[in-house]
Amino acid sequence: MSWFGSSSDSTIELDNKIQEATSESIPNGELDLPLALEVTDLIRSKSLPPIQCMRSLKKRLGMTYSNPNLLSSTLKLVDLCIKNCGSHFLNEIASKEFMDYLVDFIFKVHYDTKNYQVRNSEAKMNVGELILSLIKEWSILFSNSSDLSYVTRCFERLESEAYNFPDFAETSALNSKFVDTEVPPDWVDDDKCMICYDKFSMINRKHHCRACGGVFCQTHSSNFIPLVSLGISKPVRACDNCLAKQKSKNKPSQHNSSSHSRGTSRVQEDDEDEMLRKAIELSLQDTQIPVSAPVARDAPTNSSQTKTITDEDDDEDLKAAIAASMKDYQDQERLREEQQKQWQQEQEEKHHQEEQSDFYNYSIPKPSNYSQQLPYVQSVASLTEEEEADINKFITLMYQVKNDQNISYARLHDEKLTDLHTKVCPLRSKVTKNLIYTVERQKAFTELNNKIAAITRLYEEHLDSKLKQTYGYQQSVPPVQLPEINDYMRGPQSNYEQSIPAQGTGYQQQAGYVHPETTGYPSYPGGQQPIPQQPIAQQPSGSRPSAQQAQKAPEQKHEQQQTSVPTFAYPPQESYPPEGEDDEEQSNFELPPLPNQAQNDFSYPPTQSYDSPSEPMYPNDSTDQQYNVYPPNGAGSEESKDEYSSGELQPVQPTREHVLRTRSSELPPHAVEQASARFPPIDTVEEEYQNSNNSSVPYPDVSFPIAPTQNLQPQQEPPKKFVPEPEPLIDI
């Protein structure tokens, strides 16, 4: 039952006290005995249910079983609670819940004395033997109680398993009296007061006495006293009978304590008198004054004359001793003053001789060591105001003599300057000593300042580490470092890298894609590594028609129409160097600039699409209209003619930014040869496009790089077909 406050607060208080009593700062598995006794008082006072107290100790065992020292201190605390907390707590300790946890989990799993790992560790072996000794001791203490027989059964079970229990030297002295502890009694219920026998009602309410557990009215239970014998240190309600018993117990103890204090005070007075008498005798012997024989106090003196005589004798002896001690003290003081004066005179004479003999001597005089007194440390004499004024005046005059040549001769023979020189020269040694002293002090203060700064820095680092450990101010994710782009990646891409992407990528980058360089963070679209944007060279002036060429004759329009046909740069077979020559071929070709400041580069389809060249360029775009990159091989096919002869033009696909990709390691070694063999040459494509009689191109805003003609060497070039040139229209 919970009498004082809420049970949760009491539980927290008990857990904290258990943790402090078995703190890890206590060495060798010992206990903090005052805190441990507070734990036992808290359990014995029944402020918490006994099962809750047992579970608090069990929880502490579970928290400390991996540390042998903490486990030893916790086991000792459990043993102390068993011997001081009463029968209500023993019933919970002897339960199956606690004993099985102690024996089956802590002992047999972690500290089994039969295990070779435990035997190799001295600390674990000591803990295992401590558990066995405690179980054996508890079984002896609980042998006379049938309610606590489960501990005895656990002991017998371990004994049958051939565990060696330690022997006790005083086993016969252990009995049930070690666990007999006075605890608060259980409450008794009744309908009337046990003193006045008045029945309880709405007005006359009943109250329980914490000392005896009886029921009493307000009149006979209005007393509040602490019950220390029951482990209750706070004032609690008690009846009149229990109050009278408590007072009767305290009276003889107070009487005994008062008589004992009187006896001790008398003994102390006698001892002081004896010590004073001995001191007086010793002092009189030193001064060679005759000492009168001490008068024995034990002799019976009935007359008043003997008392006065002894008092007078004591007074005379005391006065003589005081006078002798004062005389010795005065002599010692006089001798000390004379020695001090003599030493000061010697130091002044020595210092004066050093100044007169050599004022360049910078050594500070060291006082001689005297056996009778400590050496006197002389402070460095500072300059007076007059001396400083003389020095400043001398410096000013000498400065004027050096700078002004007209008055230099007159000033050099001036008597005042000569007098100042005689005054200033003896001060040189004093100034030098002051300078040396100041420099030493400055060095000392600098060292102290450095030490204080170092200590402050170490303290701040220690405080920061503690704050980080406490509040978790730790950087969980390291800062993202952008990959550096080397010179190889910054250089211009080869024609191979511009025209053929990595295998498995057959579509361009979308227009809404933000390049990683604009955001500052690396992005990896499609699971590929980011490739920095390559610089694109300017297109030659003859590669695209200008605005002036568009206004010329219709004959020139036909030529411009031929030059605006999308052409594809097929690298020759010999332009693909081996793996070691990639860096040399990086700067062979350059891309021309695209119209409208947009980079729209078309690349070859992936390897798996060579069998079907009419596959869409952007397989993932379902909403856009699909186009064929190359026209069909048959120049005279009806499907291609119908497609190009239709009056309505198909919508132009929006331009997309192209991500330049480096050559993938998965590209077949003969991919270029296969591509040039499967696809027709560029001349055939131009002729087929001219025969289609279509006035517009599918991609008017797209231009493709044209490789140099001297490097293009197709393997098999089909014969060209003759196509008649259409006649120009006559304007009417």
UniProtKB/Swiss-Prot annotation:
Entry keyword set: Endosome, Membrane, Metal-binding, Repeat, Zinc, Zinc-finger
Low complexity bias (residue ranges): 502-513, 520-542
GO cellular component, one term: endosome membrane
Domain UIM as annotated: residue spans: 271-290, 313-332
GO molecular function terms attached to this record: phosphatidylinositol-3-phosphate binding; ubiquitin binding; zinc ion binding
Record flagged with keyword Repressor: no
Coiled coil feature spans: none
Positions bound to Zn(2+) 2: C209, C212, C239, C242
Main location group: membrane
PROSITE patterns for the chain: UIM, VHS, ZF_FYVE
Topology relative to the membrane: Peripheral membrane protein
Ranges annotated as biased composition (Polar residues): 253-266, 492-501, 596-612
Residue spans of biased composition, Basic and acidic residues class: 329-340, 655-664
Gene3D superfamilies to which the protein is assigned, alphabetical: 1.20.5.1940, 1.25.40.90, 6.10.140.100, Zinc/RING finger domain, C3HC4 (zinc finger) (3.30.40.10)
Family: Belongs to the VPS27 family.
Name of protein: Vacuolar protein sorting-associated protein 27
Organism encoding this protein: Scheffersomyces stipitis (strain ATCC 58785 / CBS 6054 / NBRC 10063 / NRRL Y-11545) (Yeast)
UniProt gene name: VPS27
